């Protein structure tokens, strides 16, 4: 039936029942049907008519299909759904875990190569573990890995509480952290200090990632 929306009250009415903001509904992404409450779900599979069409495509296509994946879980799902490899693994996405981002921020705030390498060495086990798990899921399929690409300002603390936590851990002032964060800000980050430029300025980052990649494969 038709859905009657009331944006002011943040509610809609369907099939004689009114749903309010926060109520749980379930939507079938294939049919578009809406169901009341939370219904049991299953993982998507390549089956039925869709599966048959995909079999036809596989029979005649010449173009290989790879996917973006940055975690072992995403890699496993990609292979399950027929990907022939990983077209792009964006390693910067591997660092946003709370413990990882904290050590990465310490590296960014460090003023010497030795200090940067000290904190980067703490990240190697995480990188190595992720790559090893992804290799296992790929079972010999190819993977293109992109080293840390974004400008470093994307990793810096955003709140005063985060800045204070970082300052306390490194034995520096909050003002020092704020100064570094301000200095890292870029007007046009898409064309700025990123990618290969970042690797030229801080080769120790690329060395850490290269080591993790190779050791995971051994």
For each predicted feature, which ranges?
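Surface loops and adjacent helix of pleckstrin homology
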Residues: 30, 37-39, 148, 157
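Short, compositionally biased
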Residues: 35-53
């Amino acid at each position: 039936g038709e859905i009657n929306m009331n944006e002011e009250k943040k509610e809609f009415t369907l099939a004689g029942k009114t749903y309010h903001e926060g109520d749980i509904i379930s939507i079938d992404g294939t049919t578009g049907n809406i169901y009341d409450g939370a219904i049991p779900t299953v993982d998507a599979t390549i089956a039925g008519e869709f599966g048959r069409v995909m079999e036809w495509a596989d029979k005649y296509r010449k173009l290989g299909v790879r996917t973006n994946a940055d975690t072992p879980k995403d890699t496993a799902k990609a292979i399950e759904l027929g990907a022939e490899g990983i077209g792009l693994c964006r390693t910067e996405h591997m660092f946003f875990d709370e413990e990882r981002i904290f050590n990465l921020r310490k590296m960014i705030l460090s003023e010497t190569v030795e200090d940067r390498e000290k904190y980067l060495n703490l990240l190697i086990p995480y990188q190595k573990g992720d790559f090893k798990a992804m290799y296992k899921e790929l079972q010999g399929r190819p993977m293109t890995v992109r080293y840390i690409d974004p400008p470093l300002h994307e990793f810096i603390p955003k709140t005063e509480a985060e800045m204070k936590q970082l300052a306390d851990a490194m034995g520096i002032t909050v003002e020092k952290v704020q100064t570094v964060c301000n200095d890292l800000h870029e007007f046009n980050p898409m064309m700025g200090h990123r990618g290969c430029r970042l690797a030229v300025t801080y080769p120790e980052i690329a060395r850490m990632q290269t080591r993790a990649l190779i050791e995971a494969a051994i």
